[in-house]
Amino acid sequence: MEVCKDELCESNEIHEDLLKIVDETLPEETELYDLAELFKVFGDSTRIRILFVLFEAEVCVCDLAKALNMTQSAISHQLRILKQNKLVKSRREGKSIFYSLADDHVRTIINQGREHIEED
């Protein structure tokens, strides 16, 4: 892989004041890991599609499967991942389980992502 010269420093000067600020503000490794794991969840387009459906309404697995033209098993697998990562929540009503967004942060994350990819 070729390295662009413009991306390398021509000087080896260390900026101690900047490094001190970085050291004071950089989150702990566990928080960085957890954040990276959260963003991995958004790396699957099926899960994103499920979240978009849940933006509109609380729905059961049957309705999600029909709306997304997928099997209930496939939807359930993705919902389990979303639920484990606290992006969706569920409630039982009789024989059905209904899913909804866990909170407004989920919508905000998706909307911020959409704004980012639509930038010039």
State where each predicted segment sits.
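Beta-hairpin "wing" of winged helix-turn-helix
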Residues: 83-93
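Recognition helix of helix-turn-helix DNA-binding domains
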Residues: 72-80, 92
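N-terminal leader segment of winged-helix/HTH proteins
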Residues: 1-42
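N-terminal helix-turn-helix DNA-binding core of bacterial DNA-binding proteins
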Residues: 27-73, 97-104
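Conserved segment of winged-helix/HTH DNA-binding domains
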Residues: 100-120
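Alpha-helical residues within the helix-turn-helix
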Residues: 66, 77, 83-84
